[in-house]
Design a protein with these regions (language model features):
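An exposed, glycine/acidic-rich loop-and-rim segment of catalytic or binding clefts
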Residues: 1-172
Length: 172
């Protein structure tokens, strides 16, 4: 979880996020992926240009409304033909306040981005600070969520997370 502003008492929606992805996997009201792969174009899911997170949040958009922020998987453009380019930036987070830039690299096909939608419980944390909702951003590189179910259902375009006997798994 990252709050590059250095102030955990304030939400992190003023951080600038970039995600190198033309598509994302929508989730239902229980946060289970629907099996669709949708374009980000023209939606609040489009972070192909670095943008302040708060400028994209639109609670009338069903995906944002259901999750009360971002908790979604993006289908990375850095993953093609079953291979990920771990030398290319797949996502980044920047704080104009601190000047800190975080760059994310992975060989995985997807990245789950979570904006602390269930933080802000009022529980005192480090130094007695009560973290607000949306205080931080988390990047989780991964296969697409609910992969075993979607593969079993024959969903096209879904990445398989099955580790077969004798095979090695390596993720970075």
């Amino acid at each position: 979880y990252f709050n590059l502003n250095g102030d955990p008492s304030k939400e992190g929606f003023d951080q600038v996020m970039y995600i190198n992805a033309d598509k994302f996997t929508p989730a239902d009201s229980l946060y289970i992926p629907t099996g669709e792969i949708k374009d980000v174009e023209g939606t609040p899911m489009d972070f192909r240009t670095p943008t302040e997170i708060g400028k994209k949040v639109d609670y009338s958009f069903d995906q944002i409304k259901n999750a009360t922020g971002y908790d979604h998987n993006w289908c990375l453009n850095t993953y093609k033909d079953g291979k990920g380019d771990d030398k290319a930036v797949c996502a980044s987070l920047y704080s104009p306040k601190s000047g800190i830039l975080l760059e994310v690299f992975t060989n995985e096909p997807g990245i789950q981005v979570y904006t602390g939608n269930f933080q802000g419980t009022g529980i005192a944390c480090k130094h007695g600070i009560k973290y607000p909702k949306h205080v931080s951003v988390c990047f989780e590189s991964q296969k697409y969520p609910d992969s075993p179910t979607k593969i079993a259902q024959g969903v096209k375009g879904w990445t398989d997370a099955t580790l077969k006997p004798g095979k090695k798994y390596y993720s970075h």
